[in-house]
């Protein structure tokens, strides 16, 4: 993987860059649609590529490991061939599931024992095995195995967890470096900064991650319930330490406002289930603000979903029709809303990049944040 930093905004730390992988190029800032089990819910690959214009998607190691399983994925030739996605893929390591499956797992120095949410069967992930699993899945960018601490989190626990994550990272790097890609193309390993909401821990973790000198870096353990101000504060702390010549990935973030504010702090990559999850509940992000399509005010509104939208569904379908589908619980309603929301997120980061390059990102961002806070 190569990263070319094209320019930095004169009034903030926002950056425009280009990531090159063996499955194609990624213009940054970038939003990555989440395909947890190998699919972005309700969206065909052709729609993702041609209509939404996604440049990279995300898969979930924990879910793919359990189903369809490594045997099927390896026989298929990796996730790209299994799901037909021709562009880059990023996989997380399962560390977030360590956090989210708190009732089903046990953490020790060696690794994590957890019970499957599908059938209750027991499994054990070590940092080394997390690398092996991601070699089989075959994503272009893979993540180190870490523990994502909850919020709130007591200082002592956050410190011990961070230090263990650092030890796990060394084991991940050793395993990654002694193995090769199974499918003939390059893979890249990103370490993850942790430290909860403690300034000194975030600084220490960022310094350690930077010292590992990998090709890109991630920030984890944010957007887990802490106030947005804490998210921005600790993103700011970390991005001032991580090297500028490598991409920075803020994991699991977030709302359009979160994305805009952290682009301004120097973040390059984002993922979040929000656009598709909200879509399935009738919540739409538009260029003028936020819409609950189930509200009665849209019942006879025959205007396009978003006249400024970039996807086919934005101009072809009306708000009234989408409301009808959503209220009726028709599958098509969730599909249309998902395509719209994902297209909006991709449009948002593309516009951010355009304005960073043009030199007017700050005033554009200020106006967009105002619009994104508006409920229509």
Range-by-range predicted roles:
Residues 1-182, 296-299:
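Non-catalytic, usually N-terminal nucleic-acid engagement modules in DNA/RNA processing proteins
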Residues 1-18, 26-32, 41-42, 146-153, ...:
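C-terminal extensions of enzymes
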Residues 24, 57, 92, 134, ...:
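Conserved, mostly hydrophobic/aromatic
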Residues 33, 63-64, 96-97, 149-150, ...:
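Short, solvent-exposed loop/turn segments at secondary-structure junctions
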Residues 53-55, 85-89, 138-141, 184-189, ...:
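Short, well-ordered coil/turn segments that N-cap beta-strands
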Residues 129, 133, 160, 164-171, ...:
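A non-catalytic, amphipathic alpha-helix used as a structural packing/dimerization or gating element
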Residues 151-154, 159, 216-222, 331-334:
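Glycine- and acidic
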Residues 163, 175, 179, 188-305:
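Glycine-rich phosphate/ribose-binding loops and adjacent secondary-structure elements
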């Amino acid at each position: 993987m190569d990263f070319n930093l094209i320019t930095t905004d004169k009034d903030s730390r926002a950056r425009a860059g280009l990531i090159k992988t063996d499955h194609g190029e990624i213009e940054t800032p970038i939003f990555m649609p989440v395909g947890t089990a190998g699919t972005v819910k309700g969206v065909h690959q052709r729609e993702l590529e041609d209509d939404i214009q996604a440049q990279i998607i995300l898969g979930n190691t924990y879910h793919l490991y359990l189903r369809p399983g490594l045997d099927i994925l390896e026989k298929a030739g990796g996730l790209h061939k299994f799901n037909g996605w021709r562009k880059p893929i990023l996989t997380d390591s399962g560390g977030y599931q360590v956090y989210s499956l708190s009732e089903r797992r046990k953490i020790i120095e060696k690794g994590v024992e957890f019970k499957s949410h599908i059938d209750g069967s027991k499994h054990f992930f070590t940092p080394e095995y997390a690398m092996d699993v991601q070699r089989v899945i075959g994503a272009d960018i893979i993540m180190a195995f870490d523990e994502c601490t909850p919020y709130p989190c007591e200082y002592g626990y956050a410190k011990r967890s961070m230090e263990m994550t650092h030890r796990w990272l060394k084991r991940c790097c050793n395993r990654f470096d002694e193995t090769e890609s199974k499918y003939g193309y390059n893979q890249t390993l990103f370490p993850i900064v942790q430290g909860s909401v403690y300034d000194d821990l975030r600084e220490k973790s960022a310094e350690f991650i930077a010292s590992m000198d990998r090709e890109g870096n991630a920030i984890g353990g944010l957007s887990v319930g802490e106030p947005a101000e804490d998210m921005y504060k600790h993103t700011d702390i970390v991005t001032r330490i991580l090297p500028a010549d490598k991409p920075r990935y803020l994991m699991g973030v977030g709302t359009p406002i979160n994305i805009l504010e952290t682009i301004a702090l120097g973040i390059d990559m984002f993922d979040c289930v929000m656009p598709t999850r909200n879509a399935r509940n009738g919540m739409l992000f538009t260029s003028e603000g936020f819409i609950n399509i189930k509200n009665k005010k849209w019942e006879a509104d025959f205007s396009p979903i978003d006249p400024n939208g970039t996807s086919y569904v934005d101009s072809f379908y009306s708000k009234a029709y989408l409301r009808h589908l959503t209220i009726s619980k028709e599958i098509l309603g969730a599909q249309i809303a998902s395509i719209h929301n994902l297209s909006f997120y991709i449009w948002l980061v593309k516009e951010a990049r355009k304005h960073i390059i043009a030199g007017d990102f700050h005033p554009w961002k200020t106006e967009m944040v105002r619009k994104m806070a508006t409920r229509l």
